[in-house]
Regions:
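Flexible loop/hinge segments at secondary-structure junctions
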Residues: 2-179
Length: 179
């Protein structure tokens, strides 16, 4: 995107998020003036298998399950929540296991902004600089696994493990209601 002009570079691309300021700067440095045009909206789901226990999770509970860092006794610490009931005793004692899109994914960007940053701002009352630094990284201890961009594969993995959660767009989920 915006690497240059000519046959070897695309004239049109699409994304599931707005153009970032850093991308606009990259475009400008390559002599390109990007035109952003919104075609529609989608949503993000946090889903598990149809045959699984259906949990009613808050954004705060999801944040606490997937964020690399959480607040404990007024300090930002590594996330040590192992089960959903560690986060909220009313949730079942099942291991936290979440499939996440890769860092290159617009779905991940949207999730980080709409769930992680938004929740972190509210529950920890942090400045933008602080919450972006402390609340952007996903866990790397096995509770969260990058699953790639293939939503069909994520569906297969959710079907194979009833306790696992995954994220993808609402429009994709709508097409896969039977799963």
């Amino acid at each position: 995107f915006c690497a240059g002009i000519g046959l070897e570079h695309p004239d049109i691309t699409n994304a599931s998020r707005a153009i970032k300021e850093t991308e606009k700067k990259d475009c400008a440095s390559n002599g390109i003036n990007p035109i952003e045009y919104m075609i529609g909206y989608d949503g993000i789901t946090f889903s598990n298998s149809k045959g699984s226990e259906q949990l009613s999770l808050t954004k705060e509970e999801i944040f606490k399950a997937v964020s690399a860092k959480v607040m404990s006794n007024g300090m930002i610490v590594d996330n040590n929540f192992k089960t959903w009931s560690d986060i909220n005793p009313s949730l079942p004692t099942i291991e936290i296991d979440v499939l996440a899109p890769p860092p290159s994914s617009g779905t991940r960007d949207a999730f980080v902004e709409l769930v992680m940053h938004d929740t972190c701002k509210k529950i920890y009352n942090m400045s933008k600089k602080d919450y972006k630094a402390s609340c952007s990284a996903l866990r790397e201890d096995g509770a969260v696994t990058e699953a790639g961009e293939n939503d069909n594969l994520i569906i297969e993995k959710l079907s194979a493990n009833k306790d696992r959660f995954g994220r993808f767009g609402c429009s994709f989920l709508d097409q896969k209601k039977e799963m």
